[in-house]
A protein has these predicted regions:
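A short-motif feature that recognizes glycine-rich, charge-decorated loops
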Residues: 76-110
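Short, flexible N-terminal segments of the mature chain
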Residues: 61-79
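Extracytoplasmic/periplasmic, Sec-exported soluble proteins
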Residues: 60, 87-94, 120, 144, ...
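Bacterial N-terminal signal peptides
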Residues: 14-23
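Bacterial N-terminal signal peptides that target proteins for export
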Residues: 2-15
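Short, well-ordered, aromatic-rich surface patches in folded extracellular/luminal domains
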Residues: 27-56, 110-254
Length: 254
């Protein structure tokens, strides 16, 4: 004689079956590792760390703190110090692979796309982007403590870059503001002043509130001098008073 299962037994079996399926699926997901294969083209950006937002101060630069391209070329700001000029170097394929493995091992690829504390105003957003052959992973963090993200950012900015040299872009920018008398360092030497555009161009840039372009070589020389000074920007005397000049790789559009 066949026995009949009661309603309670059927429900219990269904729950057990679903639990077993969920366990198998979860186990499979945990075992699957992210493929770290990437395009080795020198134009392809593989890893990027970028900070944006914050109070609208004129010396905030829009350039990313770290970029690694497919051919191993790296452009970074040493130690993340915003006052230091950018440098560039190159990682071997093995070193690039090790960096990606470090990022993966932090749990970065399991993070959500965004973490934000909306209670804080005028904060900064940090973004890490990793472009691999199997897809792009981008995580943005706004004023929150996300351990995996912070660890990944630490690996990126702390990764040793051998034989680095000055990063010289094709062009740079100067943000010019009219200013009142203020504490300043010693006047810039004549060789630095000589790198600046004519006074009339500086005044026009200040009136238009638009950055003025200069050569990459001039930008780097100006930045190197400014980084040794106590105050941000170069104060330049003009007939109508003075202007403060802020050198930038990429002006921030607000």
């Amino acid at each position: 004689m066949k026995s009949r299962l009661g309603k309670a037994e059927i429900i219990a079996m269904a729950v057990l079956t679903l639990a077993l399926v969920a366990t198998v699926v979860a186990g499979g997901c945990e075992k699957k590792e992210v493929s770290l294969a990437y395009d080795s083209s020198p134009e392809d950006l593989v890893v990027e760390l970028r900070t944006s937002g914050g109070l609208p101060t004129p010396w905030v630069d829009g350039i990313s703190e770290f970029k690694m391209y497919g051919d191993g070329r790296v452009i970074e700001r040493p130690g993340g110090d915003e006052r230091k000029p950018m440098v560039e170097g190159r990682l071997t394929p093995g070193e690039a692979r090790a960096l990606l493995e470090n990022i993966r091992d932090t749990g970065f690829f399991r993070l959500k796309g965004e973490y934000a504390n909306r209670k804080i105003m005028d904060g900064v957003t940090q973004r890490i982007t990793v472009n691999l052959k199997e897809g792009k992973k981008e995580v943005r963090v706004y004023m929150k403590d996300v351990k995996e993200f912070a660890t990944a950012a630490g690996f990126i900015m702390g990764y040793p870059l051998r034989d680095s040299s000055d990063y010289v872009p094709d062009k740079g920018y100067l943000l010019v503001q009219k200013s009142q008398e203020a504490p300043t360092d010693q006047p810039a030497p004549t060789e630095v002043i000589a790198l600046l555009p004519p006074t009339a161009d500086l005044l026009q840039a200040a009136d238009n509130r638009k950055p003025i372009e200069i050569s990459g070589e001039s930008l780097v020389s100006i930045m190197k001098y400014e980084s040794t000074q106590k105050y941000r920007g170069l104060v330049v005397k003009v007939d109508s008073g003075q202007v403060t000049v802020f050198p930038l790789y990429e002006p921030v559009v607000r």
